[in-house]
């Protein structure tokens, strides 16, 4: 497996240097950014596997940047921040963060959690996604293209899917008509176990629905099964 690339987005120099030293000592390739502009520049130039980001940043804060990150890149995301209230933590996870750690942090715990996250996200589905006999799934005029990890609309327009959305859609298409619990979907999407107040699945499904549901509040393709989870009701072509 390639050496993981970690991007640290932190405007405080001492903390940034500390994190860089910690992860370089573990053998990772480490990149640094102090704000959103630098983050996007690095993401456009390098294949980043994990972003470790503070919330309190100059310009756009980490929560806003996390929303952009989830729309634009397939990358694992960990918040490392001094904001330790439950509201920020829940919001961060709702946006799609894979982990949330508060300062001051234990370096050993941080590296273990980063390693576990990288192991899950870099290995999750790589074999199964690359060795499938089918290259795409077509339903209701739409196509899920596995090689490009994108949705193609009836008009031919292509929508590149973030990692979590692609994995959710792939799981739905492989299991049409079956009820999928939030715990199972989260495991497929991120490798994480479902915890109380984790809204990652619901937020992800809401984003997916915006692509192909004409009325997302009354969805027909991905149905909500109250108290159980979600079910893919699309008309898959043979």
Swiss-Prot record:
**Residue ranges for the DNA-binding region feature of this UniProt entry:** 134-234
Its primary localisation, in coarse terms, equals cytoplasm
Cellular localization per UniProt: Cytoplasm
Chain ranges of the Response regulatory domain: 5-118
Gene3D superfamilies (alphabetical): 3.40.50.2300, 6.10.250.690, Winged helix-like DNA-binding domain superfamily/Winged helix DNA-binding domain
According to the UniProt entry, its GO molecular function terms are: DNA-binding transcription factor activity; DNA-binding transcription repressor activity; identical protein binding; phosphorelay response regulator activity; transcription cis-regulatory region binding
**Entry protein name:** Aerobic respiration control protein ArcA
State the organism named in the record: Escherichia coli (strain K12)
Give the encoding gene's name: arcA
């Amino acid at each position: 497996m390639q050496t993981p690339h970690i991007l640290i987005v932190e405007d405080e120099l001492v903390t940034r240097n500390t994190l860089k030293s910690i992860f370089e000592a573990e053998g990772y390739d480490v990149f640094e950014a102090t704000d959103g502009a630098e983050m996007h520049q690095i993401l456009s130039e390098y294949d980043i596997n994990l972003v470790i980001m503070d919330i309190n940043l100059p310009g756009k804060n980490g929560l806003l940047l996390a929303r952009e990150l989830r729309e634009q890149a397939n990358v694992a995301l960990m918040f490392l921040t001094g904001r330790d209230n439950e509201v920020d933590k829940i919001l961060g996870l709702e946006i799609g963060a894979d982990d949330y750690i508060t300062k001051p942090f234990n370096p050993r715990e941080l590296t273990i959690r980063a390693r576990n996250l990288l192991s899950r996200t870099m290995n999750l589905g790589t074999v199964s996604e690359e060795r499938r006999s089918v290259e795409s799934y077509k339903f209701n005029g739409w196509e899920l293209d596995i090689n490009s990890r994108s949705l193609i609309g009836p008009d031919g327009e292509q929508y590149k899917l973030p990692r979590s959305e692609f994995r959710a859609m792939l799981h739905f298409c492989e299991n049409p008509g079956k009820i999928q619990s939030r715990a199972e979907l989260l495991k497929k999407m991120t490798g994480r176990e479902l915890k109380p107040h984790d809204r990652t699945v619901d937020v992800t499904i809401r984003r997916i629905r915006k692509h192909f549901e004409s009325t997302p509040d009354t969805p027909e393709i991905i149905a909500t099964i109250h108290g159980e989870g979600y079910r893919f009701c699309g008309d898959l072509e043979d």
